[in-house]
Regions:
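A residue-level detector for the "anchor" residue at the start of short, highly conserved motifs
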Residues: 1-213
């Protein structure tokens, strides 16, 4: 009987720098970022519920099915939805959820603290503080690895550096005197050198990429 109930795991893995689109049995789309994995039990998936486990970063576009909620588990958190699109990014100390459409329930920690997030909202769970922080302002750059677009609206230099470092996977040094500078610009699939040139010229700044992260 143990054998019969044993999970039949289907696992999909990506190498660093690789991206992969995966369709689950219910047509839910999972876009895996580099150095990530996802798995589900083929025997049980879409029977009573739709449960997935993951590590790393992934974007989900969930096929709506009110009878069978969809849930994603990371090491410390869980997201449950009916039908929506959202991203989970699990880093060593923080797990972040960004909701693009629909509504999700984000549960975290041993206390099973939970928050409801709607389109445009995001939340972070800190492993250190054991707390969920909710952000109501939408940050489109969190999805730049999927869209190829980086958008800045009156963004301070620190935010620009953080987003560029994350997107291009490099370290960027700020050798700028102009600390209070803010950037308004949109970049579509541009190489880092071009972006840095625009930022430096526009803001009279000096940002230099130093190395791979």
């Amino acid at each position: 009987t143990v054998e019969r109930n044993a999970p039949d795991w289907v696992a999909i893995t990506t190498a660093p720098g690789q991206m992969k689109d995966v369709y689950l049995p219910d047509s839910t789309l999972v876009a895996l970022a580099g150095d990530s994995w996802i798995r589900y039990d083929a025997k049980r998936y879409d029977k009573e519920r739709r449960a997935v486990e993951m590590n790393g970063k992934a974007f989900f576009q969930v096929t709506r099915n009110e009878a069978r909620p969809f849930s994603v588990k990371t090491s410390q958190t869980e997201v449950t939805v009916l039908g929506t699109s959202f991203q989970i990014d699990e880093k060593p100390t923080v797990t972040e959820v960004n909701v693009v459409t629909g509504k999700v329930c984000f549960t975290a920690g041993e206390e099973k603290e939970n928050v409801i997030l709607t389109a445009g909202m995001s939340a972070q769970y800190s492993m250190e503080n054991k707390e969920i922080t909710v952000v109501t302002e939408e940050d489109v750059n969190k999805l730049a690895w999927r869209t190829g677009q980086l958008r800045f609206m009156e963004s301070p230099l620190d935010k620009v550096i953080e987003d560029l470092s994350d997107y291009y996977q490099v370290k960027i040094a700020n050798q700028t005197k102009n600390e209070g500078a803010r950037l308004t610009a949109t970049f579509n699939n541009l190489p880092l050198e071009d972006v840095l040139q625009v930022v430096n010229q526009t803001l009279d700044a000096r940002l230099v990429s130093t190395s791979k992260k």
